[in-house]
Regions:
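Eukaryote-biased recognition of electropositive, low-complexity segments
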Residues: 274-424
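N-terminal beta-strand/alpha-helix entry module and adjacent surface
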Residues: 1-219, 224-322, 393, 413-419, ...
Length: 465
C-alpha cells in the first residue's frame, strides 16, 4: 500500500518476510457481477465493488471469527492516516501498558511514596480481541504430530515440544497468516501422567542456529493433555470443552510469557513491536473421544497484564486471579465486557478473578492435502532415553545408510541437531550440511561428503559401531 512504502522500521529489528509481503498487498475482496448490477462489464456498483479485508459481513458469512492482523492494521490506517494527512502520520498500533511509571516527572516521589494521575495506569477493560496475529496452524505432515504423541501412547506420560517452522500467507482469510510446522523439538523435561516439568535447556541456542540455517525458527509450543478413556479402542477423555476450560489459567499465563519473549516486529507500532506470532497448541481429547490439536494465542492485553505482573493462576483452571497492589506493583481497577442474557454489553468487575476466555484467541489448524514436508523423520527423537529411544553413534550410522546414496538421508531435523552437537564438523561444514538440506543442490552434497570433517565423522562411526 502507499503508506506501507513510506513507513519502514527505524530500528535494526527486521520484519518477517511474510509481513513485508502483506504490507504491500491491499487485500481487497473481489466480488462477481450479480443479477442486481445494472451496468456493463467494465462498470462497478455497490453490489460488486471489492470489499475491504476487514468487512465483518464477509468474515461472518465465511465463518471467520477474527479478522487478520494485517486487515486490522489496514482498517486502523484507513481511519487514522488518510491520503490527505500523509505528512502527519500516526502509528496505528500501540501496545497496552498497565505498569505504573516509576520515573514520573510529576514532581513527586516515585511510587509507592507518591502517585499522580499522570503515572497511574488507567482502569482496564478487557474484551475478547477481534483480530489475531496468526490465523492458522498447519503441521507440514501428520507424521510430525503422530511421532510427538507416540510418547504418550507408549508410556502414558505427557509431553512438551517446541514448534520450528515458518510463517506463510493463508489464503482462506483476507491477508491471513499461517504458521507451518516442520519439526517438533522436545527439550529436556520430566514427563509425568498429569503434566510436564521443564528442565534447563542448555543447547537451545545451538538448536535455534541449526533451525535458522534451514530457514526455520520457533513459531510456538505444543503439549499433550491426554487421558485414556479405558475403552480399549484408543479413545481419550474429553476434558476441555465449553463447560470446563480450553486453556487453563496456568497455560494462558505461560502462553503470554512466551509471546512477550518472542515479540512481533512491525513498522506499524511506534515501538516497532506489537504483540507476537507465537502459538500455543494443546493435544487433547475431542467430544467424540478422538485425539485432536487445538491452537491458541492470548491477546495483547494478556501480554500487558503479565508484563505488569497483575495476574496469577487460580485454583480454578478456567479463572485468572488478579493480584493485589503491593510494593512497586500498582494494580488498577479491572473490568471485563460481556454480553448478558438480554444481548446487551455490560461491564463486570474482574476482581478477584475473571474467566480465562477473555484473554484467548482461537486459531484454525489442519494438515495439508498434499504434504511436502521438509524432513523425513527417521532419527531417534531427543530426551526419550526413558523409552529406550537413544541418540548415539549407532543411530547416526543407521541414518546414513538410508536413502539412495544422495542427500535425502540428511533430511531429518533431530539428526542435524545431533550432528551439530557432536562437534566434529567445523562451522563452515555445518553451514554446508544445512544448505545441502535446505536447497538440495548436488554440488553442495558432493562438497560435503568430500570435506575433511565429514570423512572424520565416517571414520569415527566405522570404529564405533
Amino acid at each position: 500500500s502507499e503508506i506501507a512504502s513510506i513507513i519502514v522500521p527505524s530500528s535494526g529489528k527486521q520484519e518477517l518476510p511474510i509481513d513485508q509481503q502483506l504490507n504491500k498487498e491491499e487485500g481487497m475482496i473481489s466480488r462477481p457481477k450479480l443479477y442486481m448490477c445494472r451496468h456493463g462489464e467494465k462498470g462497478m456498483c455497490e453490489y460488486c465493488s471489492p470489499l475491504p479485508p476487514w468487512n465483518r459481513d464477509y468474515l461472518d458469512e465465511h465463518g471467520i471469527k477474527h479478522k487478520s492482523f494485517h486487515a486490522h492494521v489496514k482498517e486502523l490506517n484507513e481511519q487514522q492516516n488518510t491520503k490527505n494527512n500523509g505528512l502527519s502520520y500516526i502509528a496505528p498500533l500501540k501496545e497496552p501498558d498497565y505498569t505504573i511509571d516509576l520515573n514520573c516527572g510529576g514532581g513527586h516521589a516515585p511510587y509507592p511514596k507518591g502517585i499522580c494521575s499522570k503515572c497511574q495506569p488507567a482502569p482496564i477493560t478487557l474484551q475478547q480481541q477481534k483480530f489475531r496475529m496468526v490465523d492458522h496452524l498447519e503441521y507440514a505432515d501428520h507424521t510430525i504430530l503422530n511421532l510427538f504423541i507416540d510418547t504418550w501412547r507408549q508410556s502414558g506420560v505427557q509431553r512438551y515440544g517446541v514448534l520450528y517452522g515458518r510463517y506463510e500467507a493463508y489464503e482462506k482469510v483476507p491477508l491471513g497468516i499461517k504458521a507451518v510446522v516442520e519439526a517438533i523439538y522436545e527439550p529436556p523435561q520430566a514427563s509425568e501422567l498429569d503434566g510436564v516439568t521443564l528442565l534447563p535447556w542448555e543447547d537451545e541456542e545451538l538448536v535455534d542456529k541449526v533451525a535458522l540455517g534451514l530457514g526455520l525458527y520457533k513459531v510456538g509450543v505444543v503439549f499433550t493433555d491426554l487421558t485414556d478413556a479405558k475403552k480399549g479402542d484408543g479413545s481419550v477423555l474429553c476434558k476441555r470443552h465449553k463447560d470446563s476450560f480450553f486453556l487453563s489459567c496456568i497455560e494462558a499465563i505461560m502462553a503470554a510469557r512466551n509471546q512477550v519473549k518472542y515479540p512481533n516486529v512491525t513498522r506499524w507500532a511506534a515501538s516497532q513491536e506489537y504483540s507476537s506470532k507465537f502459538v500455543t497448541c494443546v493435544i487433547t481429547g475431542g467430544l467424540e473421544g478422538e485425539i485432536e490439536p487445538r491452537a491458541y494465542q492470548v491477546s495483547a492485553s494478556a501480554e500487558a497484564l503479565v508484563k505488569a505482573d497483575d495476574i496469577s493462576a487460580s485454583t480454578h483452571p478456567n479463572m485468572i486471579h488478579i493480584k493485589e497492589t503491593s510494593g512497586t506493583r500498582y494494580v488498577p481497577d479491572v473490568f471485563y465486557s460481556k454480553i448478558n442474557e438480554y444481548g446487551l454489553e455490560v461491564k463486570e468487575n474482574a476482581k478477584p478473578a475473571f474467566p480465562v476466555d477473555f484473554l484467548l484467541v482461537t486459531l484454525l489448524d489442519s494438515f495439508p492435502l498434499n504434504p511436502q514436508p521438509m524432513f523425513m523423520l527417521k532419527f531417534p527423537i531427543e530426551a526419550r532415553d526413558f523409552l529406550g529411544e537413544l541418540q548415539n553413534m549407532r543411530a547416526v550410522h543407521t541414518q546414513l545408510q538410508l536413502g539412495q546414496g544422495d542427500a535425502s538421508k540428511l533430511r531429518d531435523f533431530h539428526f542435524l541437531v545431533y550432528v551439530a552437537k557432536m562437534d566434529i564438523l567445523s562451522g563452515d561444514e555445518i553451514d554446508l550440511l544445512l544448505r545441502c538440506v535446505r536447497e538440495g543442490k548436488t554440488e553442495d552434497y558432493v562438497a560435503l561428503v568430500e570435506s575433511g570433517g565429514w570423512m572424520t565423522l565416517l571414520t569415527i562411526l566405522d570404529h564405533s559401531v
